[in-house]
């Protein structure tokens, strides 16, 4: 019987944290029963790229580098399932756009709420905050919710 092929996607932050530890533990555990292809892109790759600040900001919405690398990966392999841990900030929602056109099911691990809140906790200035929920991150940018930037 052929082992299932799993595409395991993770966007690394600048520092190792719980999400990354979880990603590696799941990769190792799944490796016992499936062929796992880790697809990792680092925030550092984005922030230390030669692109200008406006281009980098645009990559938060659609990262062409990630899209090209992921398309290459999909041309070379066929996957039975996708597991996505996070795409913010380095990968962008283009990962989900590509996943929609694949026959494989997608599982998304929600380690935090960053997809709807830049600081990931729906809390700002001592009170609940849902200003960015729905995908408009402008309030979070104005209030410097992510890394106080």
Identify the role of each PLM range.
Residues 42-73, 84-86, 146-149:
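A short, charged, and often flexible helix/loop element on the N-terminal side
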Residues 13, 43-46, 89, 113-115:
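Residue-level marker for beta-strand->alpha-helix junctions and adjacent short loops that shape enzyme
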Residues 8, 72-91, 105-111:
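Short N-terminal targeting/anchoring amphipathic segment
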Residues 23, 66, 91-92:
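Amphipathic coiled-coil/heptad-repeat helices and related helical stalk/stem segments
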Residues 49-53, 110-149:
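Acceptor-binding helix/loop patch of EC 2.4 sugar-transfer enzymes
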Residues 1-44, 75-77, 95-105:
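N-terminal subdomain of nucleotide-sugar transferases
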Residues 16, 92-93, 116-117:
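Glycine/Thr-rich phosphate-binding loops of Rossmann-like dinucleotide-binding domains
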């Amino acid at each position: 019987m052929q082992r299932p092929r799993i595409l395991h996607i993770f966007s690394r932050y600048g520092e190792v944290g719980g999400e990354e530890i979880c990603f590696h533990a799941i990769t190792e555990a799944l490796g016992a029963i499936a062929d796992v292809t880790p697809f990792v892109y680092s925030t550092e790759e984005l922030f230390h790229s030669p692109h200008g600040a406006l281009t980098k900001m645009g990559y938060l919405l659609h990262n062409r580098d990630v899209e090209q690398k992921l398309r290459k990966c999909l041309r070379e392999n066929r996957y039975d399932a996708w597991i996505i841990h996070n795409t913010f900030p380095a990968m962008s929602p283009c990962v989900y756009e590509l996943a929609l056109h694949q026959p494989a099911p997608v599982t998304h691990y929600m380690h935090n709420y960053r997809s709807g809140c830049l600081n990931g906790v729906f809390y700002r200035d001592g009170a609940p905050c849902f200003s960015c929920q729905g995908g408009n991150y402008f309030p979070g940018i104005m209030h410097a919710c992510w890394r106080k930037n």
